[in-house]
Structures are given as structure tokens and as C-alpha cells.
Amino acid sequence: MSLFNTVRNTIVPVHKEGYPFVAAFFVASLVLGWIFKPLFWIGMIFTLWCAYFFRDPERVTPQDDDLVISPADGKVSAIQMVTPPAELDLGSEPMLRISVFMNVFNCHVNRAPMRGRIVSINYRSGSFVNAELDKASEDNERNGLVIETRHGQIGVVQIAGLVARRILCWANTNEPLDAGERFGLIRFGSRLDVFLPAGAAPRVSLGQTAIAGETVIAEFASAKGPVISRHS
């Protein structure tokens, strides 16, 4: 496992969800290399790509409870006022939705956009159309979190994509989250939607590249309530 440790510790950390995949590709490379030596190097290319896909770099998150931080690496694909998904129970009034689309080359670890406490987690099965399409918000498999923040409740929805077939969320209801804290992962291409209440103004533009845990995607004008911390 020396190669695995090198990739994890020297190049960039690999998320634990990727360990089985990296190990499987590495073993397959050894087997193929035993059959035909050049196949080992081809297999190693795929092994390194898999480690790259599951990379989990450290991020420096702005410490300001009025800021909304990107929950995912990728491209800002939508900024619009829409009615939030019914399963989030956020009401029927339009909310600001900012969507970040992740392709297969982006880091797929998802991070909390704001500090708060998880009110609910709602999973919905669905199809697997291209996550960049607008209808993916309603048709695709998804997992939605509602987070209570000092500016009210916000929604964060993990949406599976054309290639993605597994949404992972290790957060639990009633748990606190810090801005930039890891809470989930989606394998192989997907999208994150953030739903924000009145008072939030976008700070990104369509097509802009966002970095999870670092890029400010929206901002609230002023504080509305007490800071929600792990000790609240």
C-alpha cells in the first residue's frame, strides 16, 4: 500500500470513501501487469486518476456568519429565484437558488455553506439525467438538508448526475455544522443546490468556477439572530 500512502500523504489526501476504489484499481493493475507488463502501467494511470477523483484537500473557509460558502467544487450553473423542493418543507415562497455543477474532474467532497444546525435530512429516489439540466432538480435522485442558521433556514440539496449513482451523507439530524465542514460526497459527476431565504444576495456569476469551502457565493446584509455553534 506504499503507493496509496504516497498519494494520500504526499500529493493530496484521499477521502476514505475512495480507499476501496483506489485499492481495487491497484490490485487490478498488478494482476494485469502479471499477464502483460505494459497493462500494469495502463492500470496505474487509472489508479492515479481514481485517487485524484477522491482527493480531499484542506480548505481555508472565511469565518463570517453573513457569508454563504460554496458547498462544492465546480461551475456555477444557475442563479435564480425558485420554489424550493417540497420535501425540504421550506414553504412555497421563492428562494434564491445557486447551483454548482461538478464534472468528473472536480473534487466531489461536499461542505456546509454556513454555520448552523441540521433540522432535517430528506432523501428522494429518482432518475439520473444530466445534473446540469434544470429538470435534474425535480427528476433526479437527491438528498436534501435543511440547516438552521442565524439568518433562518437554508436548504442544501445533493443531486445525482448522469454518471453518479451514489449520494453519500454522513451528517445527522440535530447535529451542528461549521461553515466549510465536510458533510457528504457524490461519486462521479453531480450538482449541489443551495436555497437561501430573503436577504441573501448572490456574489458569483454564471459560469464562474467555485471552490468548496472557500468561494463566497452569496451574502446576507446583516445578522438576524444569534450565532449557532456546537455548544448552542
From Swiss-Prot:
Query: What's one Pfam family the UniProt record gives for this protein?
Result: PS_Dcarbxylase
Localisation per UniProt entry:
Cell membrane
According to UniProt, the reaction catalysed is: a 1,2-diacyl-sn-glycero-3-phospho-L-serine + H(+) = a 1,2-diacyl-sn-glycero-3-phosphoethanolamine + CO2
Q: Name one GO molecular function term.
A: phosphatidylserine decarboxylase activity
Q: Name one GO cellular component term.
A: plasma membrane
**What's an example GO BP annotation here?**
phosphatidylethanolamine biosynthetic process
Q: Which UniProt keywords apply?
A: Cell membrane, Decarboxylase, Lipid biosynthesis, Lipid metabolism, Lyase, Membrane, Phospholipid biosynthesis, Phospholipid metabolism, Pyruvate, Zymogen
Chief subcellular location equals membrane
Q: Which domain of life is it from?
A: Bacteria
Determine if Lipid biosynthesis is one of this entry's keywords: yes
Q: Which residues of this protein are annotated with the site description Cleavage (non-hydrolytic)?
A: G189, S190
Into which family does the record put it? Belongs to the phosphatidylserine decarboxylase family. PSD-A subfamily.
> By what name is this protein known?
Phosphatidylserine decarboxylase proenzyme
- Which gene is transcribed and translated to give this protein? psd
